[in-house]
Amino acid sequence: LALAHDLGHPPFGHSGEDALERVMAPWGGFDHNGHALRIVTRLESRYPGFDGLNLSWETLEGLAKHNGPIFEPGWALAEVDAAWPLDLASHAGLEAQIAAIADDIAYDNHDLDDGIRAGLFSIEEITAEVPFVADCWAAVTKSWPGVSARRRLVPELVREQIGRMVSDLLATTRSRLAEIDARSVADVRAAGRTIATLSPALSSEVRALKDFLRERMYRAPAVARLRDPSEAVVEGLFAALHDDPARLPGDWAAHCPADEPARARHVGDFVAGMTDRYALKLYEQLVGPSPLPRI
């Protein structure tokens, strides 16, 4: 689950997803979670008798609901749910819930590391605004009083934060399992709330970290300057291939449906499966000079 839940991300991360969602809006839009399920149930072809990877129902359910119940599924998820009813209105099992919170923990902490390394903000700035980081940084500098090199202490800060989050997650999850007297996965699904989660107190502190990263990293001018060109590449590729599906490679062209929305979704599947590098290369072949530097 932890490995598979990000399979549906298109090139250029969230910028690419936003662009693909816009251009596919007339045909139901695009969602990376639904696309991940589409990959493992339809697009992969590793067996002679059927499409997909032959994953268990529990794995499909976890991929669909790792972020919680779904009441208005998009077209891709609705197709999977029609074939393998996933009880979308209930919570997923513990494995999926743990994969989701583990992803959040890793994402937040390594983005902090990346932001400092990229010079988007300093230790002084983030500790002044985020009490949780300030507390962890104080613990790190106290444990290593003779170390002045920030490049050695920042990774230790990340370890300290992850350690505290994981310890809190374990304690909170055990407590919630005891509260519902869980004897089976059915009890977890029927609990009506997330079981594997951080405590309310730490969740509030981590929310302050997320808010800081959103303002100082994700919305930073240096990052924003890459967002529009990234979206332009995805939009240009989709338009070029949707207008002339014969320009798709090999089997993608041979099996492209003639009617909509199947054709648009087929082209969307192809674009969503690209790496950043391949997207830039193909854009230059089909559209023109890339608005982004080659990777």
Locate predicted features.
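Aspartate-rich (DDxxD/NDxxD/DxxxD) Mg2+/diphosphate-binding motifs
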Residues: L1-P26, H32-N33
